[in-house]
């Protein structure tokens, strides 16, 4: 909320079911009399329907806010221009920002959910300088430690920002990962495990998970929620994850799953860490498109697409 070029209020949408950003921005203004001479700037078109919260466009018009600047329209079928139409019908000036791509990136998870009817997938892996993500090993051997402490911290920060974390039962069997955000504040994501008869899950590991997992396979263990289908066919289960409230998913492995997401054009973003270590032979890292962001995290090279 801006009054005479001064910010008098601001807000953001914390999570589904809680008040939207417009509501929080209006609530944060101490003197509501100023709203009638203020401009509301929002990244997404104000909603126009009753869902988990009331319509934001009605709240805006009820406060007499005369001017609204919007980053981008809302692709949701229940909005899609209806919010703008309501505002203009109440005499409110509505403008759109000149660079909608910036605001779509800001709301990239929502845009993927709405326009592609599936979760937003972020892929993550670490590889050494020779392009391997692990050594060839048995279940009795520990996984190869590749990235350093800063990369690990960044990974846990990523985990805290997503709804689910996806791995294969092979990765679960070989590594027994905790899949938590123990190195970063925030709630741990829901583990999503793709089952394979060749790598049955250990009951001890399943019971050790902090969050009850979602299992995907032809036959599911009793007592665990999941999707019964062929996990190798992504089309059978990817859209169903939205129904479970899993809007943003971090895919951590293994290599075959990561490559399948890339090949299926499901890799919405990729985070890759490259160490200076070398390995003559091992498990090859996925082949990915060009990366646009390059930085240094301690001794590791960080690339992101």
Predicted regions and their residues:
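Short beta-strand scaffold segments in enzyme catalytic cores
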Residues: 1-5, 125-126, 132, 303
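Zn2+-dependent cytidine deaminase-like catalytic core
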Residues: 2-103
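Short, acidic/turn-prone active-site loops that include or flank metal/cofactor-
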Residues: 13-16, 72-76, 99-100, 195-199, ...
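Non-catalytic positions within long, well-ordered alpha-helices that form the structural scaffold/packing
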Residues: 61, 242, 262-263
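Short, charged, surface-exposed secondary-structure boundary motifs
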Residues: 79-80, 105-106, 201-204, 223-227, ...
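Active-site ligand-binding patch in enzyme domains
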Residues: 112, 120-248, 256-259
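Conserved histidine-centered catalytic loops in small-molecule metabolism enzymes
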Residues: 281-305
């Amino acid at each position: 909320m801006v009054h005479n070029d001064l910010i008098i209020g601001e807000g953001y949408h914390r999570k589904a079911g809680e008040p939207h950003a417009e509501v929080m921005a209006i609530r944060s203004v101490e003197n509501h009399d100023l709203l009638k001479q203020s401009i509301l700037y929002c990244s997404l078109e104000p909603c126009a329907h009753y869902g988990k919260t009331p319509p934001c466009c009605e709240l805006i018009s009820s406060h007499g806010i005369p001017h609204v600047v919007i980053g981008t329209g809302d692709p949701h079928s229940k909005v899609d221009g209806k919010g703008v139409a309501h505002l203009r019908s109440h005499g409110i000036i509505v403008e759109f920002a000149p660079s909608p791509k910036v605001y779509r990136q800001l709301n990239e998870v929502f845009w993927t959910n709405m326009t592609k009817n599936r979760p937003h997938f972020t892929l993550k892996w670490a590889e050494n300088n020779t392009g391997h993500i692990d050594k060839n090993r048995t279940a009795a051997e520990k996984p190869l430690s590749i990235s350093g402490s800063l990369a690990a911290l960044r990974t846990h920060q990523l985990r805290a920002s997503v709804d689910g974390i996806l791995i294969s039962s092979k990765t679960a069997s070989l590594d027994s990962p905790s899949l938590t955000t123990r190195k970063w504040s925030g709630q741990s994501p829901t583990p999503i495990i793709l089952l394979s008869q060749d790598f049955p899950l250990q009951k001890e590991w399943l019971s050790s998970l902090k969050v009850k997992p979602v299992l995907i396979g032809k036959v599911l263990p009793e007592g665990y929620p999941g999707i019964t289908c062929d996990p190798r066919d992504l089309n059978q289960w990817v859209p169903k994850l939205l129904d479970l409230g899993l809007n943003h998913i971090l895919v951590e492995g293994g290599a075959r799953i990561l490559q399948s997401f890339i090949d299926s054009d499901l890799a919405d973003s990729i985070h890759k860490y490259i160490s200076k270590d070398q390995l003559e032979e091992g498990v090859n890292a996925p082949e990915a498109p060009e990366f646009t962001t390059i930085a240094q995290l301690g001794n590791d090279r960080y690339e992101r697409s």
